[in-house]
């Protein structure tokens, strides 16, 4: 049998199957929108910035994965490889965020490349090239030759938090990844936070966090990045508030390990009046942090400056740890877990709130979401030798910390990008 003919028929069947999936799933998605009286998605400036309704998410996942696969399968091999080279993002997003172009372009109006060049001091030709690269990615539009107007994406970038997040990536983050292979060659152990692509790219000593802390500007950029992620679809706090039986704890003490400025603890205290919260983080100004807590919650939300890798001095019912493990290599994550053994007793637990990578690409997540998670994973190793982990890797990690640690359960609320991993200690 001619293998080329067989493969051709299989590919033909696949592209037809993908087209059918797209047609069926778009119809399902549109039916949800119609039932709720919602407009169809568009790139228009006045399009809704809200995520699609929860009921439409499965159809959305199917459409996005199928359209991406159909696009890729129709490319020749060389084009498929080369389309992954996206260095131009660093250039045009760096320009847009540094010079606050989204807030220079008026809502409902337009501005000329000439005016943008005058505002920024750039030569008009380079302004056109940068912004037209962005326009090809649906960021801004050119409704008339020589003029720039908003799309829903560029309008969203008027947000100070999002724009600052992009500025962080452009100024500090994205080109760090270019040194990842060099760093892995130089430090093959991939464990220490001061032996990373970040160190090579910026020619600095010390860890990423230590370097961020040296500059008030960089510290604020980092804080904005954190705030941005909490608003991304799949990372919202309601997944935590609704996804765990906090009420079932009764009157309980919860320690928010590595809780930064206490946003999560404040949200928990607002929803669950029986919880007493203590936020622990390194080099924290306890008084300043507590001053920002709403007055009605001040007696239940407290702060403690503490090196989270040293022995835990406070007993609690739950030690909640959100997206801290992914900042660290296994060497330090096992140390973090061991720091809690002296305080864990029957009924208490460590509640890890973090990503779970599929064991094999495409096996348990829509691929469009997994791509983002894999990108995050590489960003973590580039900056701090952190990592995302699969279920098997989580089990291995807790056992390596101490064989008496066991994962009691893993749950992932529908629509959440983070799983709740409940770890107990069988003393």
Curated annotation (Swiss-Prot):
Which family does the UniProt entry place this protein in? Answer: Belongs to the class I-like SAM-binding methyltransferase superfamily. Cation-independent O-methyltransferase family. COMT subfamily.
Q: What is this protein called?
A: O-methyltransferase PaMT
Question: Under which EC number(s) is this enzyme classified?
Answer: 2.1.1.-
The cofactor(s) it depends on are: S-adenosyl-L-methionine
The GO terms describing molecular function are: O-methyltransferase activity
Q: Which GO terms describe its biological process?
A: methylation; secondary metabolite biosynthetic process
Q: What does this protein do?
A: O-methyltransferase; part of the 2 gene clusters that mediate the biosynthesis of fusicoccins, diterpene glucosides that display phytohormone-like activity and function as potent activators of plasma membrane H(+)-ATPases in plants by modifying 14-3-3 proteins and cause the plant disease constriction canker.
InterPro entries, per this entry?
COMT-like (IPR016461), O_MeTrfase_dom (IPR001077), SAM-dependent_MTases_sf (IPR029063), WH-like_DNA-bd_sf (IPR036388), WH_DNA-bd_sf (IPR036390)
Q: Which gene produces this protein?
A: PaMT
Q: Which UniProt keywords apply?
A: Methyltransferase, S-adenosyl-L-methionine, Transferase
Q: Any idea which positions bind S-adenosyl-L-methionine?
A: 230, 281
Enzyme category, top tier:
transferase
Q: Which Pfam families match?
A: Methyltransf_2 (PF00891)
Give the pH dependence: Optimum pH is 9.0.
Keyword Acyltransferase listed? The answer is: no
Q: Give the annotated active site.
A: 326 (proton acceptor)
> How is temperature linked to this protein's activity?
Optimum temperature is 35 degrees Celsius.
**Pathway membership:** Mycotoxin biosynthesis
